[in-house]
């Protein structure tokens, strides 16, 4: 677990703001592994760490997308905030300057998912929360400490990855793989509706390799 300014933001968001709960039942932080993502999508850069795909409020019985909300996305003007976001939540398909100027990826994620928790978190709080939750777990270092190390030719069973992430976060994750080549491309970490505790993801989309039950972690 990391200590950072955004970790302090997390405590403020959870305990001081006292947001209204009930519009969503759980929250999923979706982290993507850039190496695998960029094997199937042209990228401008490939960070050697997990990056944020999105922070998705959801319900167990239905999927929440493009919810009605008073606040639409407005471009982030603060340069420090843009730097913080780009470090943790970059658009891998565009150059840094373009990403920060046009903010298409952040706009898409907020309009599709962030508006579904707007009764609890405004736009600024939503992005702060996503970054703080990512910083809460140094997932790559933790996986390495448990013997799961990315690299060319590295393979692990789905069960080992699931159980290891359970040890790290206290909840079973949502694993996604690229089709065909079975590379681990995303890890979803689920939180309760108050975003205080990690829970088992309600609808885990685990990777389903054939034969050896191993998936690649490139």
UniProtKB/Swiss-Prot annotation:
Q: Which GO terms describe its biological process?
A: RNA catabolic process
Q: Which Pfam families match?
A: Ribonuclease_T2
Which top-level group of life is the source organism from? Eukaryota
Q: Any idea where this protein resides?
A: Secreted, Extracellular space
Q: Which cysteines are joined by disulfide bonds?
A: 38-43, 67-116, 177-207, 190-201
Q: Which reaction does it catalyse?
A: a ribonucleotidyl-ribonucleotide-RNA + H2O = a 3'-end 3'-phospho-ribonucleotide-RNA + a 5'-end dephospho-ribonucleoside-RNA + H(+)
Q: Name one GO molecular function term.
A: ribonuclease T2 activity
The entry's cellular-component GO terms read: extracellular region
What is the first-listed, main subcellular location in coarse terms? secreted
- Residues engaged in binding RNA: 32, 53, 91-92, 105, 108-109, 112-113
Glycosylated position list: 49, 59, 162
* Enzyme Commission (EC) number: 4.6.1.19
Active site at: 53, 109, 113
TM segments? Answer: none
Keywords assigned by UniProt?
Disulfide bond, Endonuclease, Glycoprotein, Hydrolase, Lyase, Nuclease, Secreted, Signal
Q: Quick one: signal sequence residues?
A: 1-22
PANTHER family in the cross-refs: RIBONUCLEASE S-2 (PTHR11240:SF81), RIBONUCLEASE T2 (PTHR11240)
Q: What does this protein do?
A: Self-incompatibility (SI) is the inherited ability of a flowering plant to prevent self-fertilization by discriminating between self and non-self pollen during pollination. In many species of the Solanaceae, self-incompatibility is controlled by the single, multiallelic locus S. This stylar glycoprotein is associated with expression of self-incompatibility in potato.
The UniProt family comment states:
Belongs to the RNase T2 family.
What name is this protein filed under? Ribonuclease S-7
Q: Which organism is it from?
A: Nicotiana alata (Winged tobacco)
């Amino acid at each position: 677990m990391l200590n950072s300014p955004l970790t302090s933001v997390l405590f403020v968001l959870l305990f001081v703001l006292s947001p209204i709960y009930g519009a969503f039942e759980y929250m999923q932080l979706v982290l993507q592994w850039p190496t695998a993502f960029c094997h199937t999508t042209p990228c401008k850069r490939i960070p050697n760490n997990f990056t944020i795909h999105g922070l998705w409020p959801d319900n167990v019985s239905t999927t929440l997308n493009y919810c009605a909300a008073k606040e639409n996305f407005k471009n982030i003007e603060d340069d420090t905030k843009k730097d913080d976001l780009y470090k943790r939540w970059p658009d891998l398909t565009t150059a840094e300057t373009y990403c920060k100027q046009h903010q298409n990826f952040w706009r898409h994620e907020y309009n599709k998912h962030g508006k579904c928790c707007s009764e609890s978190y405004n736009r600024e709080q939503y992005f702060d929360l996503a970054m703080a939750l990512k910083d809460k777990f140094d997932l790559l270092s933790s996986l390495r400490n448990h013997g799961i190390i990315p690299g060319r030719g590295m393979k692990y069973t789905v069960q080992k990855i699931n159980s290891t992430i359970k040890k790290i976060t206290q909840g079973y994750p949502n694993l996604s793989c690229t089709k065909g080549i079975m590379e681990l491309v995303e890890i979803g970490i689920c939180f309760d509706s108050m975003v205080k505790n990690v829970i088992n993801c309600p609808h885990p989309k685990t990777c389903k390799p054939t034969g050896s039950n191993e998936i690649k972690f490139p």
